[in-house]
């Protein structure tokens, strides 16, 4: 346990001098001791500058920090509580409780910097995970133990979609979940807590928050804290769900830290180590022969530009991508998932079966044709189309509306009860629309319903 002193403070970056023979290693956690508001503040070593000086990032506010304060080296990276004691609790990046419900009472702590499982230990299964959301189950099905990205600009429903997935999967799958709130709004974290409490699944969720108002160090490391807790459950042989909201803020925190450390920025001002930082996190989110981690990550898309380096780097790591479109949201169709832009490696006849594959393909073909015809309709009107094209447009409009669905977590806003639709019902409904079985039903009947039976019932009521 060597001690050093603070020699320079620049915002969240703190330089600490140690004796030459006891310099801390990179990623070691240091603790400020002594009087004042900064007592107990944790610093993480980022660089060794030579001459016994290390450059660190503060894991908390550096207000009141001054030169000359004593710093103690813990001799190991930041460690956080793991295991069942974390369930139902809200913690910060250091694993300290922030829900005013007393100590965590953990039996074990893990360090947050760990290596990814080796090739031999990783497993590759293709078991499907039913979400109960029609558009996702049909067009971009999730794999158990896979990685899913929810891509979308500001305000198109990433968090609501994620909350619905947690609600549906946590109830149906009754597994354990870890939720990492990375640089998001505190209000959303609060909503999430009460949502879980009301639906009775709070005792199955561990929550780790490093929100928007916190220093960049917290936001950069909080995803690793959540992941470490998920890894412990996986290593115990459980199937765990990891939700990260929002992975873009993780990148952004890395950009801030990189700039504070004086590194030269790369494309669009991002850190030069963007791909490596993303890889360090994503490579650890994997399933082993003992247990699985299924992860759902919300990805904010700056200015709706999917070619921005941050979302583009994230794409490479995912098995399924759910793209939320502002255009679809503006039509009032929620969830605003773009069925032509969303993809999944699982959408393969060998995995999902021939029927599912054909129906999904048919839906995409009809919607693509409708997209091409929109220009003609805008210029010449519907009357100029051939009978086949008129039928395609009619079915496409029904499919578009049938892709909408009332959510459980949005009941307060929509006023209509949420619906969980099984994969069997989803395929049956879309297959019927494609085959012309429901050509006699008006398109309004397909809007905001669960299964196809509800659409038929709605149409009969309107008669």
Curated annotation (Swiss-Prot):
Belongs to the ATPase alpha/beta chains family. PANTHER family: ATP SYNTHASE (PTHR15184), ATP SYNTHASE SUBUNIT BETA, MITOCHONDRIAL (PTHR15184:SF71). It is an enzyme of class 7 (translocase). HAMAP family: ATP_synth_beta_bact. GO terms for cellular component: plasma membrane; proton-transporting ATP synthase complex. This is ATP synthase subunit beta. NCBIfam families: atpD. Its main location: membrane. It comes from Shewanella sp. (strain MR-7). GO terms for molecular function: ATP binding; ATP hydrolysis activity; proton-transporting ATP synthase activity, rotational mechanism. InterPro entries: AAA+_ATPase, ATP-synt_VA_C, ATP_synth_F1_bsu, ATPase_a/bsu_AS, ATPase_alpha/beta_chains, ATPase_F1/V1/A1_a/bsu_N, ATPase_F1/V1/A1_a/bsu_N_sf, ATPase_F1/V1/A1_a/bsu_nucl-bd.
